[in-house]
Each structure stands twice: as C-alpha cells, then as structure tokens.
C-alpha cells in the first residue's frame, strides 16, 4: 500500500463487507498507525503482541460511556495487527479508545484485561485533560479518549533551515517553564504562542535552534506527591504514552479538551 497522505482515499471504491453494532465495516489499513480518515470513513489500526481480540469504542464528545462497541472480526486480525475501516464516521462527531483481550500471565509479561479502556498510542489528539494540577474525581474512571485529526496544515513557502550541525547554537527549554512567569513579558505565558513570542529574544542571543523538553500529552498528576510541604508534579512530561498528540495545556487557544 502507498504511503499515507493527509486524507486516505485509497479503497474509496471498495464496499463494506460486514455490519457491526450498526456500522458498516471492512478490513482497514494494516500498514498504517492509529486512526486514518478517508473519504468514506476512518480506518482504525492498532498493533499488540499477544492480544487475541480487540474492540473499538466510540464516544460522543465529552461523554464517558461509549455509544458503540465494535469488536474486530477475527479476519481483521493479521499477525499482531488489528485493522478496521468504519464507514460513515465524521471525525468531529466522535472520540475513540480500544479494549484488548488476551492472556494474563505475569511471568511472561502479559497483563491483558479486556475491561481496561486504552488510548491509541498513535493518537494525534487526546481529550479528557483537567486544569493543570487538578486531581480527577475518584469515581471518574478512565477519562482519556483520542480524536481523529486531519493532517492538513499549510506549510506555504516555509522550508527547513538546514543549518550545518557544526553551526548549531541549541537552546533547550520547557514550553511551560520558559514563559510562565510574568517577567517573560509575553501575552500567552506557558504556551507555544509564548515561546513563539520569545524567538526574537533567542535570536538576539545568537540561538539558531530550540530543543524542547516533552511537548506531547502527559498526565502531570502521574507520581504527584507532597515533599516537605510542597506539591510536586510530573512537570517535565517524560512518559511513554501519546507521543504524537501535542500537549493541549501548552496551547493558547481552545483545543479539543477545552470545548
């Protein structure tokens, strides 16, 4: 199969083969990652070593209970990959997650639980975040879902600067920490926009490259604790989930999780 564009129209003429929970489906794109929008629906692909079954959960935006559960037919499972194209979905009308079934054997490192709700590790947007530093209610359960996002940003005439490695002057920084304090003098402290407003300052210093600490979605309450009376958070964002979803708490505008 060809490489992915911003919208996949391959297979447009291929008809649905099955109906699951009221949705027409057919095998999806096995060499893709995550959710890929097409002209007629969305292909959902997930890879898991050891999984024996997979269910796609569909949620209406901001709702905690799924309105549809689509169990992948056995024929849609090849090797370690589950792939299913669901027809008729509009990407701004739903959120999604997965459930995986399989063996539970600690000695083999297999910890499957078919009741666990799982994020798509290749999600381009994640919903369910709280205000920074707020703990979830104890009865909330799993509140994080994924959104499908079009890769349609117009780069215009922008090109990569191609600065030789020996000429790089790299400034490493944290998006939130760099401009969070009012002394930074920006209008959108602690955000990508605040960082953008500081580019002239960095250039005046002679900096020609910025290296950012993690900017993907992460849970700042992971390992949160109080030490010597001070509340500590996972400030840096080093974890192993949602590498492809920008952190919406670093956005200066309304995003998926702030609707």
Feature names for model-found ranges:
Residues 47-53:
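Short proline/glycine-enriched turn/loop motifs at strand-loop junctions of beta-rich domains
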Residues 202-230:
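Carboxylate/His-rich catalytic cores and anion/metal-binding grooves
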């Amino acid at each position: 199969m060809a490489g992915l564009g911003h919208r996949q129209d391959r297979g447009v003429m291929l008809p649905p083969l099955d109906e699951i929970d009221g949705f027409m489906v057919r095998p999806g794109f096995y060499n893709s990652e995550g959710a890929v929008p097409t002209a007629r629906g969305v292909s959902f692909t997930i890879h898991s070593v050891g999984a024996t079954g997979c269910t796609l959960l569909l949620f209406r935006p901001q709702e905690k209970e799924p309105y549809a559960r689509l169990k992948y037919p056995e024929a849609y499972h090849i090797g370690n990959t589950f792939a299913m194209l669901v027809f008729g979905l509009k990407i701004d009308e739903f959120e999604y997650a997965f459930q995986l079934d399989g063996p539970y054997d600690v000695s083999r490192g297999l910890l499957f639980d078919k009741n666990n709700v799982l994020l798509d590790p290749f999600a381009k947007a994640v919903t369910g975040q709280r205000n920074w530093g707020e703990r979830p209610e104890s009865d909330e359960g799993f509140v994080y879902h994924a959104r499908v996002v079009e890769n349609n940003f117009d780069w215009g005439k922008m090109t990569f600067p191609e600065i030789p490695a020996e000429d790089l002057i790299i400034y490493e920084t944290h998006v939130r920490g760099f401009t969070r304090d009012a002394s930074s003098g920006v209008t959108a402290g602690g955000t990508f926009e605040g960082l953008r407003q500081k580019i002239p300052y960095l250039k005046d210093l002679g900096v020609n490259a910025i290296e950012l600490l993690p900017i993907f979605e992460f849970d700042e309450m992971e390992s949160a604790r109080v030490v010597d009376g001070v509340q500590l958070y996972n400030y840096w964002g080093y974890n192993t989930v949602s590498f492809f979803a920008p952190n919406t708490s670093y956005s200066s505008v309304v995003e998926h999780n702030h609707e």
